[in-house]
Regions:
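CheY-like receiver
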Residues: 9, 131-173
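Short amphipathic alpha-helix used as the core "switch/output" element in two-component signaling
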Residues: 52, 74-88
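Active-site residues of response regulator receiver
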Residues: 65, 97
Length: 173
């Protein structure tokens, strides 16, 4: 566990990109990030602008909405998690969505999201996800078409039948 002073220093030094087509939601997330001590926050109103901002500012964390016109959150993550074509494939990504269906959570894991966060979001929930990606990052792995954070079950040494496809994971960092 990280002490309060160290956490404050980490948040103060962290650059966060918020990608959401709703201006109000970007404002809410910005306010919550500022309340936990994040000072450098970039915003993008769509997936394409978000990809451009990742390339230009190299954020430490990306918070992306699932449902957006054009490039949605899942496609956004697929593009970012393409190390052959994208310059920052290891950036931690938190999926922020109003859709908590099991299928969405599973798809988020399958495309390479680090953390999943439901709307409406609280400061505590956002802080917990930020702490997770900044102070306890999961190693990145490659398996077939998958590139992203190692599944938690793999890290814990537990493999359920549904995780057999992940058995051939290769550690990349």
């Amino acid at each position: 566990m990280v002490d309060t002073r160290a956490l404050a220093a980490i948040f103060a030094a962290t650059k966060v990109l918020v990608v959401d087509d709703e201006h109000y939601m970007r404002k809410v997330v910005r306010t919550l990030l500022m309340s936990i001590g994040v000072r450098t926050i970039y915003e993008a109103a769509n997936g394409s602008a978000g990809l451009d901002l990742i390339r230009s500012v190299a954020p430490d964390v990306v918070i992306v909405d699932w449902e957006m016109p054009g490039i949605d959150g899942a496609e956004f993550v697929r593009i970012v998690r393409s190390p052959a074509t994208f310059p920052f494939p290891n950036v931690p990504i938190i999926m922020l969505t109003g859709h908590g269906e099991r299928s969405r959570v599973i798809e988020s894991v399958q495309v390479g999201v680090n953390e999943f966060l439901l709307k409406p979001v609280s400061s505590k929930a956002l802080q917990d996800r930020m702490v997770a990606v900044l102070t306890n990052p999961r190693p990145f792995v490659r398996s077939g078409d998958y590139y992203g954070p190692a599944p938690r079950k793999m890290i814990a040494g537990v493999h359920a039948d549904t995780d057999r496809a992940m058995a051939n994971l290769v550690l990349v960092n």
